[in-house]
Amino acid sequence: MAPLKKGGEKKKGRSAINEVVTREYTINVHKRIHGISFKKRAPRAIKEIRKFAMKEMGTPDVRIDTRLNKAVWAKGVRNVPYRMRVRLSRKRNEDEDSPNKLYTLVTYVPVTTYKGLQTVNVDEN
């Protein structure tokens, strides 16, 4: 059994989940829809992108841009691209009566190659 720490005081810092931030990610869609039947591949890819954004940004309200939807569906329902570069933007919700203060907007970033790309913070411009 692990020994108990004495004086277990935690620093009370600000949660990073409440900050407005934008990051670019590469999502491996192929591994997320592996084994899914043909007629459900593109819809499942959209659900998996939504799930990924929810996990990374910590907001239950995720909005997917129409250009990203078109990019997923570009080759049909069964031939979804293997990887996608997306920009996740955590933003403040302007709607006062919404239960969530923040939402995540997922937009498509077209790239020629995925080699050497890493997750990067994008400054708000």
Curated annotation (Swiss-Prot):
Gene3D superfamilies from the UniProt entry: 3.10.440.10
Annotated keywords: Cytoplasm, Ribonucleoprotein, Ribosomal protein
A Pfam family: Ribosomal_L31e
Subcellular locations according to the entry: Cytoplasm
Domain of life: Eukaryota
GO MF terms, alphabetically ordered: structural constituent of ribosome
SMART domains named among the record's database cross-references: Ribosomal_L31e
Coiled coil: none
Any Gene Ontology biological process: cytoplasmic translation
GO cellular component terms, semicolon-separated: cytosolic large ribosomal subunit
Subunit structure: Component of the large ribosomal subunit.
Role: Component of the large ribosomal subunit. The ribosome is a large ribonucleoprotein complex responsible for the synthesis of proteins in the cell.
Family statement drawn from the similarity comment of this UniProt entry: Belongs to the eukaryotic ribosomal protein eL31 family.
Listed name of the protein: Large ribosomal subunit protein eL31
Gene field: rpl31
